[in-house]
Structures are given as structure tokens and as C-alpha cells.
Amino acid sequence: MAVKELPMIRERGVCCALPVVQESWAIDRAELMKALADPTRLTILASLWKANAPICICDFTAGLELTQPTISHHMAKLKEAGLVDSEKRGIWIYYRLRDKLPTATRKLLSQLIA
């Protein structure tokens, strides 16, 4: 049986075109995942999700047995990711889950926390 060479229809190494995905979309999702990819931050978010009122940073330090600078570091990451808001009351800072989270983020959190 003779071996026949098949004609090349596509360029070598290119099977099909990828669907268009905006780089900014991927960067935003990756930043969100980075913020969520820590057990302490997930615990903080779960506490804020279940709370009826803002929570003082001092309550997190006592409840999680971590130092205030460590909790502040985690809160900064969550704030940068757009997940929490804060307000200063005297010498303490109180945190709450951001009211206007994107629907997709809220759904993701509800699945992670519920």
C-alpha cells in the first residue's frame, strides 16, 4: 500500500482560532482569585458575609489570633480587590463587605461561603 502525502489545509501548529478574551478581563479575574487564594482572607470574607454590621479590626485580631499588622495586610489585599470597604471610628477601623459587588463576584462568594 502506497503512502500518500495529504495536502496541508492549515498552517503548521494552528488548529483553529481562539475565541477573543480581553486581557483586562483576565487580569481582573486573576486579581480577584489572588485575593481569595488565602485561608485567612477567606475566613475574613466569610465573617463579613455573615455579619449584620461592620467588624472592627480588633475583633479579627482576637478571633483569628493574628497580629494587627497581619490583619491590616490581609484587609489591604481585600480592599485592593474591591471586596471590602472600611470606615474609621476613633482609633479603630471597621470593615464590611462592599455593598455594590459585581453580580458574578457576589455569586462566587455565596458559593464559596454558603
List each model region and its residues.
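Amphipathic alpha-helical interaction surfaces in cytosolic regulatory modules
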Residues: D38, H73-M75, E80-A81
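N-terminal leader segment of winged-helix/HTH proteins
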Residues: M1-L36, L109
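N-terminal helix-turn-helix DNA-binding core of bacterial DNA-binding proteins
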Residues: I27-T67, I93-K100
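Short, charged/polar, Gly/Pro-enriched secondary-structure boundary elements
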Residues: K100-R106
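Beta-hairpin "wing" of winged helix-turn-helix
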Residues: K79-R89, R96
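Base-recognition residues in the alpha-helical recognition helix of bacterial helix-turn-helix
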Residues: A46, S72-A76, I91
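Short hydrophobic/aromatic patches at helix-to-coil boundaries
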Residues: S110-A114
